[in-house]
C-alpha cells in the first residue's frame, strides 16, 4: 500500500530506480498476505475486527512518525507484533503458515521503512487509511491550545489539495498566514475579542498574511507552491491555510500546515519548489508585529501593479497611507478596537492618508507614481497601499510598500518622474491627526479638484475648524466608536463653519468659504469634510489650514472677494461647543435661509435652550454614543422650547419663536435644531443666542407675534430632560399638542413621579447603548393607568390630566406620546410640577367632572415599581376592560407574581437593557402563574385565574400581560398588592371555576425564573401544555440540573445584553437527550419525563419549548422538584416505554453545557442522531479537548453579548480534521469517532452539527469522556 505522500508537484523528481525493487517486494508480500488470509478463512467481525485493524494502523502510523522518521532501529522490531495482531487465524495448527509468510513480509517492510527514512529524514509520514479520512491531529494533552484547527498533523500534499479543492468549490479564496511562536497564540495584542457575534469557525487571531489572499485561485497546485515557499522561508514559524470569504471579509476556516521545527511534532521536510512567486516577506521572529499584511517585502512595480489591477477589478479604490514608526503599530491612541464586527482583512489602525482615496482610478501606473512620490517624501516612514471600499467606507485589504530606511531590507525602486500636485506635511515627531491631516497647503486648483469629486459623489462640502488645543483626539471631543467599521471620517468633534453646504454645485462656493474662514481664524486648524446627509456622517475630510507659525510652509492663497453672510465666534481659549456652536449672531435673513433648507429636507425645526452651566458636554446631560456613527447632531440634552414644530411650512413661524425664547431667557443659550421625526434624532443644530455679556451683542429686532406657551426658568434649576421646562399649559394648549399626537398615530400616555424619583438616576433610568438620542425621556416614571390606546379626542386626555393632578398635587405629571409599534415614548412634556415649587403661577384648570374608573397608589415616599405598579386595586369590570384591549391587540394575557422581597428591581431578578429601546414592559423577572394564556378570547378566563392566584398568594404582588410573538412583556399592571399594605383591601368575590394548576409558595423561597413555582403536574396537565407547544411548531426539550446548579449564577447563566426579555430561562441546564425535533405526540414527551425522573430523583427537571429556527428556548416549566423539598411528593405511575439514551449523574459533578451528561452512546444511537443532523443540511464535526481545557474558561470561551442563548456550546475545543462538509452517511462519522477515540483516550470528544451558512455550531453532544474519570465507557 502507499506508505508515503504523493509526489509534491510536477517539478519534483520521481522515485529513483534503485528503490523499485523495494516497492515490488512490498507488493508481492501484500499478495502473500491476501492468499494467507483466504486460506485460513478469516471472517472479519462487523463490530470488532475493523476496530482492531484500525488500532494497528494507528500504532503503525505512530511508529512511522516517532520511530522510523527518527531512524530508530528498536522501533522496527516492535512493528512485527503490531502487524501480526491485525491478522487472525482460525486454528492453532495453521499458525506456521502465517509465520512463514509474515517473517519475510516483516523484513520487506523494515527495509522499505529504512530506505524511506534514509531518503527523506524530515518527512512526517502520515498513513492515509483507505476506509478512513486522511488527517490526524496532534496531542492536546499538556499542550498550549490553538483554536479550531490547530492540532492537525503535518499534512501531505494530497491531503492539503483535497481541502483546497473544497475551499475553492465553496467560492472562497485560499489565504496563507504565518506567525512566530511567541505571537501565534491568543493574546490581547493580536486577538479580536468578539462581542455580539456568533462563534464561527474562524480563528480570531491576527497572524501575518503571506502575500495577498489568492483571489481567483482555481488550482490547488498554486496553493501548494505557496505553502512550500512559505515553509522554506519560515521554518521556525507556524503557518496556516485559511479560507477567506471576500464578500463577508472574514476567515471562514483555517488549519495549520506547519508547526515550528523542534516542536513536539515531527519536523517538516518538504522538497524545495522550483517555481516561486515574486514576493518575499520579512522575518517575523523577534520582530514587532504588524497586522495582516505587514511583513511583505519590498515589492517591485510589476508586483504592485498586479495587486492594483486586482484591487481595481474588484471595484475598490487604491488608497495610500503612511505613518511615522512610533505611530505605525497598534496602540489605543491610533487604533479602533472593534466590538461587534467580524475580523475582516482591514487594518484597524489610523494611519495618515496620502492625499484622498484614488476614486475612479483605472490604471496601476497612477498608483505607482503616487507610491514613488510618497516614498521620496517620507523615507523614514512606513507606507501602505490599501484597497478602500467607498460604499462600505472601510479598508478591505492593505499591504506595506515601504518600511523605514535602515530596516532589514533596502529599497531599490527607481524614482518616478510623473508626480501628483499635492504634498504632505512631515509626520515624524509630529502630533498625529487622523486620516487626512498631513496634507500640505493646497492650491485652489487642488482643492477644487477634490470638491468636484465630493459633489459628484452626491456629498455635501462642509467646513470645520478648531483651536489647536481642541483639534486632536481626546476623550472630551472624540467619539470612541464601538460596533462600527473604521470608515474614512474623522471621529473628533470640530466646530462647523456655518451649516453643511447642502445643494452646493460649484467648487467656487466652497473656495470662498475656505477663504473667509482662514481670514477669521488664522490661528486655527480648518478642514473640509464631505458630509453624507443620508447617513449623517462625515465620509472624508482633509485639512485646508494649519495655524500660522507651524512647521508647514506659509499659505499663499489669494483672498476671496465674495463672502457669505455668516461669521463665527472665536474658539481660541473658548470652551468648545460641539458642531455648530461658534456661529455668530445671525440675522433673520440668515436664519430664514437655513430654516428653508431644513423644511425642504422634510425636517422639523425645534428650539432648545439651556442655562450656561448646563449647556456644555457633561455626563448628566449627554448621551455617550455606543454603536452609532457620528452624525451632525449634538448629543446633549438641552431643554426644548415647546414641542418640535411639526408641520412647520414657513420660516417666519420659527423666527417668532426664536424672538420669544430670547426675550424669556436672555441669560441662556438657545439653539435651533432640525428634528427628524422618523428617526427621532436631531440632525443639525446651531446656536441662535448666546447669554448676554458674552463676546458679541445681539441686535435683532424684537418679534411681536408670540406663541401661547412659556417655559420655566432653567437658571439654577435642576434640569429635566427634553421637555421639562414647559410652563403650566392651558387646556387649549394641551389639546393642540394632543391633536398632533393623535394625528401621528401615537397614543397619549400619562405618567407621574414623586419629586425624589423624577430626575435621572441609575435606579429609574435606562442608559442607552447602541441607540440614537430620540426625543423621549429615558426615565421610568409611573404610568397613570394604561396608555390610551385608540384615543381619538383630546378631551379624554384632559379629563385624565385633571384627575391625576387632583390625586397627586405633590408629584410631577407628564404627558407622553407612546408608539405602540416600536414600544417607545416618542415625545413627552410636563403638565404639572409639584405645588410649592419655585415655579411659576399656580395651576388653575377647572376640575373635570367625568372621571375614569381607575386610581393609583400614592408614590410619595413609596418604594417605586416600574411602569404600571401604582395602579389601585381594580374591580373586575376595570380589569375586564383592559383584558379586552389586550386580546384585541393580539396579545396573550399572562399572570405573574412575586414575593415582596423579590418584586423590585435588583440585579438578581432584572435584565439591564443594553442596545434596546425603553418599551413599556417591566424588565424584572417575576414568576409566571401557569403558562401565558395563548389563544385566550374571553376576559372571564383571566378573571378566574386572577382570583385563584390571589387566594393562593395573598402576601404576593400579582401582575398581568404578554406578547407571544416578540416574546416580551408589552404592558403589565399590578392586580394585587400584598395584604396589609397601605392600599385598600381587596374585596373581589371569590371565583368558583379554577384552573387545574397551582404553584409553590415563593415566600422566603429561593426564586426560579419564569415558570419555576409550578406545582407537580399530572400527565393530563403536562400533555395539555405539550399539545400547545407542538401546535406552535416548537420542539419539546427536557433539561435537568442538580439543586446546587439550578439557580441563577455566573457559571451557568447568560446575562443578556441587547436582547429583549423573552419568556425563556437564561440558565444553562443539562439537556436530557436532544430536542425532540419532529415530535407530534404528547405521549412521547411523557415517556421521556418519566424516564428522566427515575434517573434523577434528586434533580430539578424542566420541560422547555425549543424554537429550532431562532435557536432559543421560548417557554419552560418545571416538571420535577427534588424529593424531600417542600412540595408534595410525585405520584405518577412509572412509564414502561423508554428511550435508548441515559445520562450521567450531575450531582456534585462539574457541569458541562447543554449536552454533556449524555451517556456512552452505541453506534446505532449516534447514527440516528447523525441522520437527523444530515437531514437538516448541517455538517457533522468532531471536536476534542483535554480535561483541563474542556470546561468553560476565559481562554477558550466566547462570552456572548447581544445574542440569544442558542443550543450550541460556546467553548472552543479542538477540531478533529475539518467539518465533514458533504457527509451523507452516518458510517463516515462513526469511523471518525472510532479513530479519534483511539488517538485520545484521555480526552473528551464531542460531535457537533455545524451550520456552514451561519458559521455556528447548532447542536453538540459528548461521545467520549476520559477513561480516567467518571463512568467508564
Swiss-Prot record:
Principal cellular location given in the protein's record = plastid
Propeptide at which positions?
269-278, 412-421, 556-565, 699-708, 844-853, 987-996, 1131-1140
GO terms of biological process kind:
photorespiration; reductive pentose-phosphate cycle
Q: Where does the record place it?
A: Plastid, Chloroplast
Q: What modifications does the entry list under PTM / processing?
A: Eight small subunits are processed from a large polyprotein. All start with the same sequence but there is more heterogeneity at the C-terminus.
Could you name the domain of life of the organism this protein comes from?
A: Eukaryota
How it assembles, according to the record, is:
Heterohexadecamer of 8 large and 8 small subunits.
In its miscellaneous comment, the UniProt entry states:
The basic functional RuBisCO is composed of a large chain homodimer in a 'head-to-tail' conformation. In form I RuBisCO this homodimer is arranged in a barrel-like tetramer with the small subunits forming a tetrameric 'cap' on each end of the 'barrel'.
Q: What does this protein do?
A: RuBisCO catalyzes two reactions: the carboxylation of D-ribulose 1,5-bisphosphate, the primary event in carbon dioxide fixation, as well as the oxidative fragmentation of the pentose substrate. Both reactions occur simultaneously and in competition at the same active site. Although the small subunit is not catalytic it is essential for maximal activity.
What PANTHER family does this protein map onto? Answer: RIBULOSE BISPHOSPHATE CARBOXYLASE SMALL CHAIN 1, CHLOROPLASTIC
The entry assigns this protein to a family as follows: Belongs to the RuBisCO small chain family.
Name by which UniProt lists this protein = Ribulose bisphosphate carboxylase small subunit, chloroplastic
Amino acid at each position: 500500500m502507499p506508505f508515503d505522500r504523493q509526489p509534491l508537484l510536477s517539478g519534483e523528481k520521481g522515485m529513483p530506480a534503485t528503490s523499485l525493487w523495494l516497492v515490488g517486494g512490498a507488493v508481492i508480500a501484500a499478495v502473500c498476505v491476501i492468499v494467507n488470509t483466504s486460506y485460513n478463512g478469516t471472517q472479519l467481525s462487523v463490530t470488532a475486527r475493523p476496530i482492531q485493524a484500525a488500532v494497528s494502523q494507528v500504532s503503525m502510523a505512530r511508529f512511522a512518525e516517532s520511530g522510523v522518521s527518527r531512524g530508530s532501529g528498536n522501533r522496527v522490531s516492535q512493528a512485527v507484533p503490531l502487524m501480526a495482531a491485525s491478522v487472525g487465524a482460525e486454528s492453532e495448527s495453521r499458525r506456521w503458515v502465517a509465520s512463514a509468510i509474515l517473517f519475510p513480509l516483516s523484513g520487506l517492510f523494515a527495509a522499505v521503512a529504512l530506505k524511506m527514512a534514509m531518503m527523506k529524514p524530515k518527512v512526517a509520514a502520515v498513513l492515509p487509511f483507505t476506509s478512513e479520512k486522511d488527517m490526524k491531529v496532534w496531542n492536546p494533552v499538556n499542550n498550549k491550545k490553538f483554536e479550531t484547527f490547530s492540532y492537525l498533523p503535518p499534512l501531505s500534499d494530497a491531503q492539503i489539495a483535497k481541502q483546497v479543492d473544497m475551499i475553492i468549490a465553496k467560492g472562497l479564496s485560499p489565504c496563507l498566514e504565518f506567525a512566530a511562536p511567541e505571537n501565534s497564540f491568543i493574546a490581547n495584542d493580536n486577538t479580536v475579542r468578539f462581542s455580539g457575534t456568533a462563534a464561527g469557525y474562524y480563528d480570531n487571531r491576527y497572524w501575518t498574511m503571506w502575500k495577498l489572499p489568492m483571489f481567483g485561485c482555481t488550482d490547488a497546485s498554486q496553493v501548494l507552491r505557496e505553502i512550500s515557499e512559505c515553509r522554506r522561508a519560515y521554518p521556525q514559524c507556524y503557518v496556516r491555510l485559511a479560507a477567506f470569504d471576500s464578500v463577508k471579509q472574514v476567515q471562514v476556516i483555517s488549519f495549520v500546515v506547519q508547526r515550528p521545527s523542534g516542536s513536539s511534532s515531527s519536523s517538516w521536510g518538504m522538497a524545495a519548489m522550483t517555481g516561486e512567486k515574486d514576493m518575499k516577506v520579512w522575518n517575523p521572529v523577534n520582530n514587532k508585529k504588524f497586522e495582516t499584511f505587514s511583513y511583505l517585502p519590498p515589492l517591485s512595480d510589476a508586483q504592485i501593479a498586479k495587486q492594483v489591477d486586482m484591487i481595481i477589478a474588484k471595484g475598490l479604490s487604491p488608497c495610500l497611507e503612511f505613518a511615522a514608526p512610533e505611530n505605525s503599530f497598534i496602540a489605543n491612541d491610533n487604533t479602533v478596537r472593534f466590538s461587534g464586527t467580524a475580523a475582516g482583512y482591514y487594518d484597524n489602525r489610523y494611519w495618515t492618508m496620502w492625499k484622498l482615496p484614488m476614486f475612479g482610478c483605472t490604471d496601476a501606473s497612477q498608483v505607482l507614481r503616487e507610491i514613488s512620490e510618497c516614498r521620496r517624501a517620507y523615507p523614514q516612514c512606513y507606507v501602505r497601499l490599501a484597497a478602500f471600499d467607498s460604499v462600505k467606507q472601510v479598508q478591505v485589504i492593505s499591504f506595506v510598500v515601504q518600511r523605514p530606511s535602515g530596516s532589514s531590507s533596502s529599497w531599490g525602486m527607481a524614482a518616478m518622474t510623473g508626480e501628483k500636485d499635492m504634498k504632505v506635511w512631515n509626520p515624524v515627531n509630529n502630533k498625529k491627526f487622523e486620516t487626512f491631516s498631513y496634507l500640505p497647503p493646497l492650491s485652489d486648483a487642488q482643492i477644487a479638484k477634490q470638491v468636484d469629486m465630493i459633489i459628484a459623489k452626491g456629498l455635501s462640502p462642509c467646513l470645520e475648524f478648531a483651536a489647536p488645543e481642541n483639534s486632536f483626539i481626546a476623550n472630551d471631543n472624540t467619539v470612541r466608536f464601538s460596533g462600527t467599521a473604521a470608515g474614512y471620517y474623522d471621529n473628533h468633534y470640530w466646530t462647523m463653519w456655518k451649516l453643511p453646504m447642502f445643494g452646493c454645485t460649484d467648487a467656487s462656493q466652497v473656495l470662498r468659504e475656505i477663504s473667509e474662514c482662514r481670514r477669521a481664524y488664522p490661528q486655527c486648524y480648518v478642514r473640509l469634510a464631505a458630509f453624507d446627509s443620508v447617513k449623517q456622517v462625515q465620509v472624508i475630510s482633509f485639512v485646508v489650514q494649519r495655524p500660522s507659525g507651524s512647521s508647514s510652509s506659509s499659505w499663499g492663497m489669494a483672498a476671496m472677494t465674495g463672502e457669505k453672510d455668516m461669521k463665527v465666534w472665536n474658539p481660541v481659549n473658548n470652551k468648545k461647543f460641539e458642531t455648530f456652536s461658534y456661529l455668530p449672531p445671525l440675522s433673520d435673513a440668515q436664519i430664514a435661509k437655513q430654516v428653508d433648507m431644513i423644511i425642504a429636507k422634510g425636517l422639523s425645526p425645534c428650539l432648545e435652550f439651556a442655562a450656561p452651566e448646563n449647556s456644555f458636554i457633561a455626563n448628566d446631560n449627554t448621551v455617550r454614543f455606543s454603536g452609532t456613527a457620528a452624525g451632525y447632531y449634538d448629543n446633549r440634552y438641552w431643554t426644548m422650547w415647546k414641542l418640535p414644530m411639526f408641520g412647520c411650512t414657513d420660516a417666519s413661524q420659527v423666527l417668532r419663536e426664536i424672538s420669544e425664547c430670547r426675550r424669556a431667557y436672555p441669560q441662556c443659550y438657545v439653539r435651533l435644531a432640525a428634528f427628524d421625526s422618523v428617526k427621532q434624532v436631531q440632525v443639525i443644530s446651531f446656536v441662535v443666542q448666546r447669554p448676554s455679556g458674552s463676546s458679541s451683542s445681539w441686535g435683532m429686532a424684537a418679534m411681536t407675534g408670540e406663541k401661547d406657551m412659556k417655559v420655566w426658568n432653567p437658571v439654577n434649576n435642576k434640569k429635566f430632560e427634553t421637555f421639562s421646562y414647559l410652563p403650566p399649559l392651558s387646556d387649549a394648549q394641551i389639546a393642540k399638542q394632543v391633536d398632533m399626537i393623535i394625528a401621528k398615530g401615537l397614543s397619549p400616555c400619562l405618567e407621574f413621579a414623586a419629586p425624589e424619583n423624577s430626575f435621572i438616576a441609575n435606579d429609574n433610568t435606562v442608559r442607552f447603548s447602541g441607540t440614537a438620542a430620540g426625543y423621549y425621556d429615558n426615565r421610568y416614571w409611573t404610568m397613570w393607568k394604561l396608555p390610551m390606546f385608540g384615543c381619538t379626542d383630546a378631551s379624554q386626555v384632559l379629563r385624565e390630566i385633571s384627575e391625576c393632578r387632583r390625586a397627586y398635587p405633590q408629584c410631577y405629571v407628564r404627558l407622553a406620546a407612546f408608539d405602540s409599534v416600536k414600544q417607545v415614548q416618542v415625545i413627552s412634556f410636563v403638565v404639572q410640577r409639584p405645588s410649592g415649587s419655585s415655579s411659576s403661577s399656580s395651576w388653575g384648570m377647572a376640575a373635570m367632572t367625568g372621571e375614569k374608573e381607575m386610581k393609583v397608589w400614592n408614590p410619595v415616599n413609596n418604594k417605586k415599581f416600574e411602569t404600571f405598579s401604582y395602579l389601585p386595586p381594580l374591580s373586575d369590570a376595570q380589569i375586564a376592560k383592559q383584558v379586552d384591549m389586550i386580546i384585541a391587540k393580539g396579545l396573550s394575557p399572562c399572570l405573574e407574581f412575586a414575593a415582596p422581597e423579590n418584586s423590585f428591581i435588583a440585579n438578581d431578578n432584572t435584565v439591564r437593557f443594553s442596545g434596546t429601546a425603553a418599551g413599556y414592559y417591566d424588565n424584572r423577572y417575576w414568576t409566571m402563574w401557569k403558562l401565558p394564556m395563548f389563544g385566550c378570547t374571553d376576559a372571564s378566563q383571566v378573571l378566574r385565574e386572577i382570583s385563584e392566584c390571589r387566594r393562593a398568594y395573598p402576601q404576593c404582588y400579582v401582575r398581568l400581560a404578554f406578547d407571544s410573538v416578540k416574546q416580551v412583556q408589552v404592558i403589565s399592571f399590578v392586580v394585587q398588592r400584598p395584604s396589609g399594605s397601605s392600599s385598600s383591601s381587596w374585596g373581589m368575590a371569590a371565583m368558583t371555576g379554577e384552573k387545574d394548576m397551582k404553584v409553590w409558595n415563593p415566600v422566603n423561597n429561593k426564586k426560579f425564573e419564569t415558570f419555576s413555582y409550578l406545582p407537580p403536574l399530572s400527565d393530563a396537565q403536562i400533555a395539555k401544555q405539550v399539545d400547545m407547544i407542538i401546535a406552535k411548531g416548537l420542539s419539546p426539550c427536557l433539561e435537568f440540573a442538580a439543586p446546587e446548579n439550578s439557580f441563577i449564577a455566573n457559571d451557568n447563566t447568560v446575562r443578556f445584553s441587547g436582547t429583549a426579555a423573552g419568556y425563556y430561562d437564561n440558565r444553562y441546564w443539562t439537556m436530557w437527550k436532544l430536542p425532540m425535533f419532529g415530535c407530534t405526540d404528547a405521549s412521547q414527551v411523557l415517556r421521556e419525563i418519566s424516564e428522566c425522573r427515575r434517573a434523577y430523583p434528586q434533580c430539578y427537571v424542566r420541560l422547555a419549548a425549543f424554537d429550532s429556527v431562532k435557536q432559543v428556548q421560548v417557554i419552560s416549566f418545571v416538571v420535577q422538584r427534588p424529593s424531600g423539598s417542600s412540595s408534595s411528593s410525585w405520584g405518577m405511575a412509572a412509564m414502561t416505554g423508554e428511550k435508548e439514551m441515559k445520562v450521567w449523574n450531575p450531582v456534585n459533578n462539574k457541569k458541562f453545557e447543554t449536552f454533556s451528561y449524555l451517556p456512552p452512546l452505541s453506534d446505532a444511537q449516534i447514527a440516528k442522531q447523525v441522520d437527523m443532523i444530515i437531514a437538516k443540511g448541517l455538517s457533522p464535526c468532531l471536536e476534542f479537548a483535554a480535561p483541563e481545557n474542556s470546561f468553560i474558561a476565559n481562554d477558550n470561551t466566547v462570552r456572548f453579548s447581544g445574542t440569544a442563548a442558542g443550543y450550541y456550546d460556546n467553548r472552543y475545543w479542538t477540531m478533529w480534521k475539518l467539518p465533514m462538509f458533504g457527509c451523507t452517511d452516518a458510517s463516515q462519522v462513526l469511523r471518525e469517532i472510532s479513530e479519534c477515540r483511539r488517538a485520545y483516550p484521555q480526552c473528551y470528544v464531542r460531535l457537533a452539527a455545524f451550520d456552514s451558512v451561519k458559521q455556528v455550531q447548532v447542536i453538540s453532544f459528548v461521545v467520549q469522556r476520559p477513561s480516567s474519570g467518571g463512568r467508564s465507557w
